[in-house]
Each structure stands twice: as structure tokens, then as C-alpha cells.
């Protein structure tokens, strides 16, 4: 027989996040919403289409990259900040940036990567070189690395549709 304790005898520990943590979470949630909206997606896509041919994989950073980076910040970061100010009373981008440095390990990789494109030139350049590689069909293709190996023999052979239906 199981001995059940009443709830008032249980020792519950309640963790309460600070107001600053809660505010940070609200901002991140709003950023996720904003970057998924059509308006932000259109702004970013149009910007990438306009300039992606300027960027290459070379180690050298061309002088032409600087005005493009500044324009990107002016258009996309300002749009993001404007949306956050409209949605969150008293929002301050400088305070958020400071808070982001303290919480960067808690932020989703995609969100952090996108935010870094506003402050880290190399992240910005990488975004463009990745976009260009994808546009030119040089994206990462893992399909050629897949091999089906038989458990009955040591020879490897590709899986054909007829073999797949036989194993079902």
C-alpha cells in the first residue's frame, strides 16, 4: 500500500523569476512574433535580394559592405525597434541589448543569430554569404552522404523502392 501525504504536508519550492527576467522573456516573445510577420520577412528578403551579389566568401571585407551594413541596421533594426516600442510600453533598445548580453545562453539560436546581424558585422556578412550560396545552389546537401548498409552482409547498397516495400 502506498502512503499518501496530504498536499499541505508536501514541501513545494516555487521558483519565481525576477521582473527583469520576465520583461526579457516578453521582449524575446515579441521579437519572435515580429520576425515571423510578413512585413519583416518582406523587408529582409527584399534587402537580401538587393545586395546578395555584393558578398563573397573571401576573407577580405570590401569597403562596399559598410554602407550596406549601415542601411540594413537603419531599415531592419529600426523596424524591429519601432514594433517593440509599439507593443511594449516603455521599451528601451539599449536596456534590452544590455539584458541580451546577460541572457544570451537562454535565447534560441535563430533569434540570437538574427539579432547578432545588427551588431556583429561578421554575423551580417555570414548571413549574406549563406544566402548567396543557397541562391546559387551551393547550400549544404546531406543527401549524397546517406548509405543503407545491410545487417546480413558487409556490403553497402542503395535502398531501392522495391526493397523498401519488401521490408514493410
Curated annotation (Swiss-Prot):
Family: Belongs to the ARL2BP family.
Gene3D superfamilies, sorted: ADP-ribosylation factor-like 2-binding protein, domain
Source organism: Danio rerio
Identification of the protein by name: ADP-ribosylation factor-like protein 2-binding protein
PANTHER family per the UniProt record, alphabetical: ADP-RIBOSYLATION FACTOR-LIKE PROTEIN 2-BINDING PROTEIN (PTHR15487:SF4)
GO cellular component: centrosome; cilium; mitochondrial intermembrane space; nucleus; spindle
Function of the protein: Plays a role as an effector of the ADP-ribosylation factor-like protein 2, ARL2.
Keyword Glycoprotein attributed: no
Keywords tagged on the record: Cell projection, Cilium, Cytoplasm, Cytoskeleton, Mitochondrion, Nucleus
Amino acid at each position: 500500500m502506498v502512503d499518501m501525504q496530504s498536499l499541505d504536508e508536501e514541501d513545494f519550492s516555487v521558483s519565481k523569476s525576477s521582473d527583469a527576467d520576465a520583461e526579457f522573456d516578453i521582449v524575446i516573445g515579441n521579437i519572435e512574433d515580429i520576425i515571423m510577420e510578413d512585413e519583416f520577412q518582406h523587408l529582409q528578403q527584399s534587402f537580401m535580394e538587393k545586395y546578395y551579389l555584393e558578398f563573397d566568401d573571401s576573407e577580405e571585407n570590401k569597403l562596399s559592405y559598410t554602407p550596406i551594413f549601415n542601411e540594413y541596421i537603419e531599415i531592419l533594426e529600426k523596424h524591429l525597434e519601432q514594433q517593440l516600442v509599439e507593443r511594449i510600453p516603455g521599451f528601451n533598445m539599449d536596456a534590452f541589448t544590455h539584458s541580451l548580453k546577460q541572457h544570451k545562453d537562454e535565447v534560441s539560436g535563430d533569434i540570437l543569430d538574427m539579432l547578432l546581424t545588427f551588431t556583429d558585422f561578421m554575423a551580417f556578412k555570414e548571413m549574406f554569404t549563406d544566402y548567396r550560396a543557397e541562391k546559387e545552389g551551393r547550400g549544404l546537401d546531406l543527401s549524397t552522404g546517406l548509405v543503407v548498409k545491410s545487417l546480413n552482409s558487409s556490403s553497402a547498397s542503395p535502398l531501392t523502392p522495391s526493397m523498401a516495400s519488401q521490408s514493410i
